[in-house]
């Protein structure tokens, strides 16, 4: 690799999970691409080769914090921290930046449990 790509790689390694998520969003916007779309194409290809078989049920879901009641900010922040394992600063930045991806690639049960936990304390969540 060139020195420039080595430098970029080292910078990427030092990013927090929240920073990496924000970087992905910025790349998607800047280049007009979607990281999720490529995964969907890969998953759809085996079903298409099956010749008329029913589409497989989606197994991974993204949990998105859409908004929250101002009076419930601290409770929502705690629920997000518990679910993601983020530090206080990263969780606060995530909650304040709503709408924001909270958890990516969660199982259906985990996504539903996280949605319930956040909505019980005053947040509005969607699952995609």
Curated annotation (Swiss-Prot):
Pfam families: Ribosomal_L12 (PF00542), Ribosomal_L12_N (PF16320). Keywords: Ribonucleoprotein, Ribosomal protein. One of its GO terms (cellular component) is cytosolic large ribosomal subunit. InterPro entries: Ribosomal_bL12, Ribosomal_bL12_C, Ribosomal_bL12_C/ClpS-like, Ribosomal_bL12_oligo, Ribosomal_bL12_oligo_N_sf. One of its GO terms (molecular function) is structural constituent of ribosome. The keyword Ribosomal protein applies. Coiled coil: none annotated. It comes from the Bacteria. GO terms for biological process: translation. Forms part of the ribosomal stalk which helps the ribosome interact with GTP-bound translation factors. Is thus essential for accurate translation. Belongs to the bacterial ribosomal protein bL12 family. Homodimer. Part of the ribosomal stalk of the 50S ribosomal subunit. Forms a multimeric L10(L12)X complex, where L10 forms an elongated spine to which 2 to 4 L12 dimers bind in a sequential fashion. Binds GTP-bound translation factors. This is Large ribosomal subunit protein bL12.
């Amino acid at each position: 690799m060139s020195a420039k790509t080595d430098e970029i790689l080292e910078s990427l390694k030092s990013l927090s999970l929240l920073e990496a998520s924000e970087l992905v969003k910025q790349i998607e916007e800047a280049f007009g691409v979607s990281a999720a779309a490529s995964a969907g194409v890969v998953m759809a290809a085996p079903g298409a080769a099956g010749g008329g078989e029913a589409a497989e049920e989606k197994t991974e879901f993204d949990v998105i914090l859409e908004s929250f009641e101002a009076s419930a900010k601290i409770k929502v922040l705690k629920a997000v921290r518990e679910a993601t394992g983020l530090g206080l600063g990263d969780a606060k930045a995530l909650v304040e930046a709503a709408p924001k991806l909270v958890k990516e690639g969660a199982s259906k049960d985990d996504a539903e449990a996280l949605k319930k936990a956040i909505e019980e304390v005053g947040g509005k969540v969607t699952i995609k």
